[in-house]
Amino acid sequence: DRSVSRGLGDVYKRQVQIGEIRDRNDKLCELAKRKETILSTIEEQGKLTEELRKRIEQSWDATEVEDIYLPYKPKRKTRAEAARQKGLEPLATLLLLQRENHLDSRLPAFVKGDVKDEEDALKGARDIIAEQVSEDERARNQLRNQFSRQAVITSKVVKGKEEEAAKYRDYFDFSEPLKRCSSHRLLAIRRGESEGLLKVSISPDDEECAGRLEQMYVRGNNECSRQVGEAVRDAVSYTH
């Protein structure tokens, strides 16, 4: 009977909707707990401003909440943290200002303790800048947007493996926007890559991403700007 099957269909739809609402509610409860943890962690550091509290409390996007938290997250011993402990944060700040044409007169002051020489000082300062850029919400959003709009996945068969890779024939010379690539295709391509039969690349590549971030952070064309540019290129690998 049609009305019975329609009625059963409606019941099933309602059950699905109830399940979806329950899942959504569970996720929101988890996020609320996570936000409490984040707020208390930042408060313990003495860095919780009223504006920061408001931003975290008002956001119900898990990715955004984690991005806001990232600069305050207790860190493992990173290269940037090691550089800070060597007293190189003021040098990183100096480089970021990008006002100095030459650094010759500034660098000797930072060569002390565990800092071996001027190049070591610059490397540490670049590590600090790279970490700051990688934790900057604007930078992360820029790369995310670039990937969602432009990312293209390309696969080619590894030379000489054509016979062995026969089951991946569809992907011997394949290219498609990543957002249109179905999950089963993506899994097959990744499997072919892990078996050493397909060569896979996803663009925009690191160079394009670095170019976008350089537009955001690099001003002028002096020695400081060049150092910041190098740090920004390093930051791209942090943000992947």
Protein language model features and the residues they cover:
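Catalytic phosphate-handling regions of large nucleic-acid enzymes and associated NTPases
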Residues: R14-R22
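Serine residues within intrinsically disordered or low-complexity segments
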Residues: S3-S5
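Duplex nucleic acid-engaging cores and interfaces of nucleic-acid transaction enzymes
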Residues: Q17, K27, L31-Y238
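Conserved small/polar residues in nucleotide/adenosyl-binding loops
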Residues: G7-Y12, T239-H240
